[in-house]
């Protein structure tokens, strides 16, 4: 999981979601695309 100031979708399978007030990107195709804003 990458922690970044600005989270962006990397591929078309990436989804931007909010969990516990944090913006996150989850990806079903490529787990390395997981990101969290912070």
UniProtKB/Swiss-Prot annotation:
An example Gene Ontology biological process:
translation
Which one of the record's GO molecular function terms can you name? structural constituent of ribosome
Matches recorded under PROSITE patterns: RIBOSOMAL_L36
Q: List cellular component terms (GO).
A: cytoplasm; ribonucleoprotein complex; ribosome
Keywords for the protein's UniProt record, in alphabetical order: Ribonucleoprotein, Ribosomal protein
Tell me which family the UniProt entry assigns to this protein.
Answer: Belongs to the bacterial ribosomal protein bL36 family.
Quote the protein name from its UniProt record. Large ribosomal subunit protein bL36
Provenance organism: Alcanivorax borkumensis (strain ATCC 700651 / DSM 11573 / NCIMB 13689 / SK2)
């Amino acid at each position: 999981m990458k922690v970044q100031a600005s989270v962006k979708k990397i591929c078309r399978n990436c989804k931007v979601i909010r969990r516990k007030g944090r913006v996150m990107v989850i990806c079903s195709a490529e787990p390395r695309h997981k990101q969290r804003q912070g």
